[in-house]
Structure formats: C-alpha cells, structure tokens
Amino acid sequence: MTLRLKNAEMHEEINKPIFVVGSPRSGTSILAWCLGYHPNIFPVPESNWMGDFAVNLAKSYQIGAARGIFSILSAMGISHEEFFSHIGRSINSLVLKHRCDLDRQRLIIAVQRLLKERGLYLGEVTGEFDAATSAAVEQYEMVDKTLYSELVDSLRTAGSDSEYKTRWVDQTPEYSFHICGLRKLFPSALFIHIVRDVDSVVRSMLNFHRIAGTHLAANEEEAYKYWLRTVRACLKAEEAYGPHVVYRLRYTTLLENPESTLRSLLDFLGEPYSAKCLEPLSERINSSNVPPDFKSEDPATDPAIVEEARRLSAEIEQTSRPTECSPAAAEELEAEFGTRIKHLARVQ
C-alpha cells in the first residue's frame, strides 16, 4: 500500500495526530475507541515513548548545535523548530504507512482469542497468522460454516477500513506530562483532556489490578496524588495553549449526552460528525468492573490530600475551560521542559 500524498500541502494537512490525555481510569481508552470508529481516524496502542523521546531529541539538538559554525545543525541553519517538526512528520508518516498492518494484527489477535475459547487453538495470542492459527481456522469451518466464511473474508480484507484514514489517536495517560514536548514534534496536534470525578477514578485505579494484574497506584493516597498530578498538568496545558489546542471533556457528559458531546468534539478536531463514533458506547461501560461493595478507603491516607483532590475535582465541574491561551503559562511549560533536558544531561 502506498500513501496518496499529492503534494507538500497534503503532507502538512494530515500531520495532525490526536492525543487523549488525563488521569488513568478517566475514560481515555473508551474515548479513543469512539474516535477510532470515525472514517478518518484510527486508534493506535498506547505508545508511551514519545514524551521521553522529545526530551532526548532536545538534548541531541543541543549537542548538534553546541559549537556554532563548527556544529552541523547550527552551521546549516537548522532551527530547533525545524529539527523537531521534521522528525515529527517522519513519525506521522511511519504510523500512517503501517496502519493497515495494525488493523490486520488486531484482527488476527481477535481470531486467535476466539479460537482459544472454542478449544481449537492452543498456542499463544501473538497477532501472527502462523501455521497453527491457519490450521485452527480450517477446523473452525466444521464448527460454524457461516461464521467461518465471514472470518476468512475479514482476514482477506483486513486493513481496508483504515487504508484511507489520515489521522491517528493515541490515549497514553502519561502524555499528560509531555504536552509541551509533543507539540514540538507535532505542531498541529490536538489534545483532549478527559476528566472524571476523582473518587471514581481512585476506586477504579485501586481495583485495576484485579483484572489487569498490575497496580496503577500502590494505595489510596498514591491514587489521589496520581490524579492530582495528571489533572494539574492537563489544566496547565489548557491554560497555556488555549481552547484551539486543548479540549476539556467531562467523562459524565460523554455517557449522558454522547451525541452532542461527540459532535462538539469532532468539530474541535475539524472532522465531520459520524454516528459510527457512538457505537462503542452501546455497550455498558463499567470501568475496571469495580464491584459495588468495593472498599477503597485506607485509614493511613492523608485526609488533606483527599480534600485537596476533591476540591479540585469540584472546581473543574463548576468552571469552564480557558477561552484564550496564556503566554505566561506556556513559558512555565517551556521551563519545565528545559528542566527535564538538564536532568537528562546530569544522569547521562
């Protein structure tokens, strides 16, 4: 498959990735899933690497321009902005180039899981259509010929849905702390800050290990602190870059008024409304499947931390997002980015 990039303007036009940020267990995944049903947007797995990559890239630029006319970047007049955005365009092109491969792998994973449930496939779920998977698919024909036919057709056409999609959405929560760096890589990127009431998030965080086997937070106090850090970082980005770059979305409005919420969101993204984006919401959302009787309270938790988080959560519910950008806040984020570069230099 080849990308249909007719000219430089087309290349610029499609270099507009979307990042869903916010605290873990706030709805980042379901929102990205909804957007992934749009005819022009496809979801990618949480990437995690691009935030730190931007910091390393900035350090590399400093080295490459350290000696003025005797360093390649400065001698050739390659600016910090050009250096970053050029590499960002390369990342974007690479993601677009392999979008059909991602679709195919996801489909094969779904097929392998289905076959394992039916006892026809005993191997690992790898996303690779190996000999064992092929043999299991053939066996499946004897079990359900109709579904077998649909399954084979799906495997043959895997990737066709995403072939002409020109934008991707990433839902890595940790990117809440890296919005400044990501904007250097992708100057036209848009960010969606999805926010959910803190108590629900904490319950979901503490219950997460029951279904995923890993802990998002060691205890209740750490969960409240985690929510505070991520949400404050996103609020600072809202203030710094304004409503044309960072869009605040409340988790409750997505559930209670999905159509109007997605219409408004897609308008922000510059995409036409598509009712297909509602399809993932037709299934009941139960974040982390938190049991009604699940107890998250810990007597060792500092009540001041809980109060601080609940107060901020209530303020967010009662206030609107900023109506304009703040140069002062943007400078703060630039300073934080610079501090990370200095820290990297020290540890290296």
Task: Describe these PLM feature segments.
Residues M1-I18, R99-R106, L206-H209, L235-E239, ...:
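PAPS-dependent sulfotransferases, especially Golgi type II membrane carbohydrate sulfotransferases
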Residues F42-L114, M142-S176, I211-A212, E297-D298, ...:
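PAPS-dependent sulfation machinery
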Residues N56-Q62, R156-C277, V290-A300:
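PAPS-dependent sulfotransferase catalytic domain
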Residues S26:
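ATP-binding Walker
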Residues S29-I41:
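A conserved segment at the C-terminal end of the G1
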Residues S23:
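P-loop (Walker A) phosphate-binding loop of NTP-binding proteins
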Residues D103-V143:
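A short amphipathic alpha-helical interaction element
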